[in-house]
């Protein structure tokens, strides 16, 4: 998400596990079996809570998938920069190409969820906001994969992760670059970025209702402490909850 402060409240092969033995990668980490049939969408109880998580065996090695995922990261960074420029020039951003890249990223995450994360750890630039947006998108897509969500839902999560804070471009620069906690008044202004994001994206033909709902609710919290609507419990929704914790 675009950065702003908030108030305080293989022999011979060098692998991630070999470099960092204390780190368990997503592909290595066991999760609770859901008991669902292969390929079945993650079930939810009436409350919208996922019935469980599932282990999905990677179909590509980390090394193979890094090669495939690297150009996706580069393309996504370039497209995010173009979208930011469009927004700053009061133009409607073109989401079609971004959705194409996100769809490819979803397939990469399904093949091996670790490759994208490792690339984002290594590929750091001065454009923190774009890297951070990609990091959020990668985590929500991987979370969706672990829950057994379908490709369309994971794509919506990825698009929302990349764009959910695009409205911060409409906020005063002094607010975004302030060091330290925001004052109560500044925080009220800061929270308007959600409405700005929705206003910017609602005019885009490729902004799906599911993506917009995730963006609208990703700062909501189940205890009602979030914003902008102070939603509680099931009203937040599973997809927005995923976006809110990543």
Model-assigned labels for residue ranges:
Residues 66-246:
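Histidine- and acidic-residue-rich, metal-dependent catalytic cores
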Residues 1-93:
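Membrane-cytosol interface segments
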